[in-house]
A protein has these predicted regions:
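N-terminal beta-strand motif that seeds the catalytic metal site of vicinal oxygen chelate
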Residues: 1-16, 68, 123-127
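Long, continuous compositionally biased terminal/linker segments
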Residues: 40-80, 86
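Conserved catalytic-core motifs of GNAT/GCN5-like acyltransferases
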Residues: 27-32, 98-101, 123-127
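Short beta-strand micro-motifs in enzyme catalytic cores
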Residues: 38-40, 66, 106-110
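Conserved beta-strand in the GNAT
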Residues: 49-53, 111, 120-123
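Active-site beta-strand termini and strand-to-loop segments that position acidic
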Residues: 41-46, 112-115, 125
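Core segments of cupin and vicinal oxygen chelate
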Residues: 7-49
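Vicinal oxygen chelate
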Residues: 9-14, 70-116
Length: 127
């Protein structure tokens, strides 16, 4: 469905370190960049995720009610995402990492805010 998602970052280096750590815990390589517009990219064959300063020159701000979810291959990877993200400047939010059961079955989730306030999570579908 998506080709890429880009979020704004006020401190590119702090955000790059956060995503290198958190996405690295999910098995991704460090971000590539900066590109000519100062963005860093994490790519998979399914799509890409990027951070950068807003092109309009205004400060980056997070989406109130928005979340970007990254897939994990195990509950251990979800916990590793959380631990690495917190150690790299992310802020713990919502419930602690763990299982939640709802209309989509049982999920293992961990939620963080990146250094610019963007809400991200790691998700593993249990069973």
């Amino acid at each position: 469905m998506f080709t890429h998602i880009t979020v704004g970052a006020n401190d590119i280096e702090a955000s790059r370190k956060f995503y290198d750590a958190a996405l690295g815990a999910l098995g991704h390589e460090p971000g590539q960049g900066p590109d000519p517009k100062g963005r860093y990219w994490w790519r998979t064959r399914m799509g890409a995720f990027a951070i950068g300063k807003p092109i309009d020159g205004e400060p980056a701000c997070h989406a109130n009610g928005g979340t970007i979810g990254f897939g994990a291959k195990s509950a251990e990877m979800v916990q590793a995402f959380y631990d690495a993200g917190v150690a790299a400047g992310g802020k713990a939010i919502e419930d602690p990492p763990g299982e939640r059961t709802g209309p989509f079955g049982t999920l293992n989730l961990a939620y963080l805010r990146d250094p610019s306030g963007n809400k991200v999570c790691a998700l593993y579908r249990v069973g």
